Amino acid sequence: MAKKKRTPQEQSADPAAQEMIIRAEELGIGTAFTRADEMPPCNIGGAGMCCKICGMGPCRLTKEGQTGVCGATIDTIQARNLTRAIAAGAAAHSDHGRDMAFTLKAAANGEAEGYYIRDVAKLRNVASYYDIEIEGRSPEEIADELADLYIAQFGQQKGEIIPAIRAPEKRKKIWKEQGVWPRGIDRETVEALHRTHVGDDQDAEHILQHAVKTALADGWGGSMIATDVSDILFGTPAPILGQANLGVLKEDMVNVVVHGHEPTLSQMIVAASQDPEIIEYAKKAGAKGVQLSGICCTANEILMRQGIPAAGNFLHQELSILTGAVEAMVVDVQCIMQALVGLAENFHTKIITTSPKVKIKGATHIEFDEHKALTIAKQILKESIDNYKNRGKTQIPSDKEDLIPGFSHEYINYMLGGSYRSSFRPLNDAVMSGRIRGVAAIVGCNNPRTQQDWLHTYVTRELLKQDVLVVETGCGAIASAKLGYLLGEAGLDKVGPGLKEVCEAIGIPPVLHMGSCVDNTRILTVLTQVVEEGGLGDDIDQVPAVGLAPEWMSEKALAIATYCVASGAYVIFGGASPVSGMPDRMSDSDIVLKHISEGWEEIYGGKLEFIPDPDEMIKATLEHIDKKRADLGLPEYDPDRFGESGDARMLELEELPLSERREAIYGVAAD
């Protein structure tokens, strides 16, 4: 039986989304929100109790002591299902890293049209990690050798993947002792599938040990490679002004929405859209020009580097088409709904697929090739412009918010100390003193089974009140952007007194936008630098920090969570657990759930837990942060200790007569 249909307000916390959901209902068009209401999740598969890896099944285990046809127990089945999901997520992000490495190779050899090395400093810095000779060599020579090194990590069969040497020393020792330092990125993913094939690995803890190894191959391998190469080719992000939400679409311009995850495509479309040839072509079609905007992680990529506006996050992909104002949605890989083509048939929008890995029946396919990138980008834009004349009635929401994205770990290092003394020391000192209680990384997807954006923004808002500095990536970052949390002055009246002092003194927003979902490796880099700076322990598991994915839905999220746990982080997911079982009926169904929490914590110092209630999620976050503070011997968090200093306080003091100012500052009267 379908559950009760939700109102637009219950389906999304975003007014722009609500407006488009109402329009969809008026037009009789279904969306992910209505499909989620009409299609209740399978309670057996959703709890990880269904096995379908062979032709003897599918086997559903719903009773105490029940096994599959082959004799597989519930813990074996759940461990296999979870590991396969982690392998799929790791494959998706790591394959993206592979493509980026090949693009770097082509650019270094002058074989990639329109691409060149934008950040030579980042190139030299990354190369130095791996003892690649940089003195007396051109950027292209360095990039060519770095690309070869990175490409080799995917097919390597023995040894250790090299990007992981950048982890803290104590963490690397744990990985070696546990035998989970990945040998090669592809090898671990292949072995994960082999181990979970019927008749293979049947010990849940042993299976999950390899899940960790597979995830690490992504986080400290493929994803880290992707972020490094993106910065080298397109520039390391620094703060820039942007906008977010459906109101960024323009009535008098050709609207092209790019959606997916590959910056090689989106960055080139940005370049092509600014070409005088394309601008003139759009004007001849009756438009003022081309308005680019992004959806999902592609949005974050072009937002944080060029300031191109974000039309929204994952659940906005259908809603943007519902405006009737989008000439083309250009997609590549990951998080792309097959429903887009059917939806677009109700309007004039063209769905253009571009990746050799992704085709959607009914979509226009223009395959992207980095060797002819600019030419193909212009072809895509011209096809979009040609569609402008077919536009019908439009309804573009007015909602949009300014934001400041682009806080790479390099920029955070710079902003804390400036050009001559860049350092994480001020951040560490702020945590040690208690001005910053701890750090929360709030990341991940939207899920139409929850109220879109609400969990992201509620958790963010409540943690800010408790002096927790928040860093965000992916769709979670766009959720906060749509509410204006990513501006320097935004919400400081609702931020705890200590965090407010830090934000005012440095000139940063209380929520730092750190990029796309693949850029979660930037957070690992920040945590590593925090450890290396000193004062907050000698490994990541000692830092007062928590990772949260309140609205997760993707296998990639499970891979990210696992490599963060293996790096020492406490990770909390909202929503349903994929390995929950039915503990009220099956006492052996929580073995896997306990192992990824208590078992992994004992081994790695990090743990993964699923907490659907947002208030319990916040409580668990603060308890963990406070425990880590106590373990480090730091002062107990006390919000009353702060709030009377910082730039705002100095401005207040300047208004006082000189005789009163000294007494206010030093507590003694003037002579």
Model-based region annotation:
Residues 2-671:
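Anaerobic metallocofactor- and corrinoid-dependent redox/one-carbon enzyme cores
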